[in-house]
């Protein structure tokens, strides 16, 4: 948030339900709120950009929150930027992750919530040069969002995931230096 504010000389507001994380952000000079309803109640105008970086997978109702952002927070020509872990690239489940996303399921969730995807990118930065660990999306509100969107189920998810993880493990053995990059100290 701070990097976006500095780079674009923009006003930013963060939402963080965790007291310790919110206090840390506030100590760095960021304007932070506790919840989405608090943000909606305090915001007189809509945002040009809403960023959800590693947030969506923690929400009990990701499509509902995406809809709420669409209808109550995002400007009509605004941008939604989000990133989630790629379900096909990770061996284990995170207990704090209430939802898992593949490229297909993320597209379906965004379509159901009334967004048009401008770009969907898979990447490994900053952890890997080889593996597509994360899904990054840039989207905008649809001009005519569907009123009764029927989700298209993804087929063969267990098989796709098993094959992706086997391929990842093989690549890691063949090229370990590019597979897992060291975490940079700050």
Where are these regions (language model features)?
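Conserved SAM-binding loop
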Residues: 1-113, 123-125, 139-141
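Rossmann-like AdoMet/SAM-dependent catalytic core
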Residues: 52, 103-186
